[in-house]
């Protein structure tokens, strides 16, 4: 039976039917099945932990890093693709996306994880070079990588996801460039989420508290950290579970959110007795 002109017009103007995904219905180890995910800074710490978790959940993952030898070693260990990338070199990002598309066959999700903190102890210790290094890696690079990736995420995915790894320092009073970059990321996430919701792309950030990684210098075997409300640092595996949920189809209504994972530490900072 031929469709009437009215039905054809209605198909064009009506939104597609909603697919409700219940997380309990998704098979264990398949919550990200078939998703093609880029994880920047995937050679250690939280990036490596997330990449492994995504692979374990059925995703086709590509990690990036600057140390090619380490990058290939980690990729081999967790069973994913790898491409060298220095986010500070924004002129290489278009070529990187082209190479990633060849390896993955498309892009469904981008995880902007790579970052650097110089942990300056005082304002007078912040240098021009150090400031620029943190801005380039933590903000400028992810900004333009997302710009290059979004058209492909929109084109190739039923529900695209972009996830930024922010920090609790983006929600606190601080002079350090690292915190400034994370505050900017939080603003960017909300702006992009509003702009791209019409294209069925969800954009969020995870804002972890102090986590046991090489960046913080905390050993996973000794998580004691008295400045967190629960007296300990967090494991990268804990943050990776949140990331897995946010990339899964069960989180399709969540966008423009900064998911803070620090046991209400930053809430406590604003709490008045």
Please state what every model-predicted region is.
Residues 235-261, 266-267:
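C-terminal substrate-recognition "lid" of short-chain dehydrogenase/reductases
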Residues 154, 161-198, 210:
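Catalytic loop of short-chain dehydrogenase/reductase
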Residues 1-34, 272-273:
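Non-catalytic terminal and boundary segments that flank Rossmann-like NAD(P)-dependent oxidoreductase
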Residues 19-27, 120, 255-273:
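Short C-terminal tail/terminal secondary-structure segment
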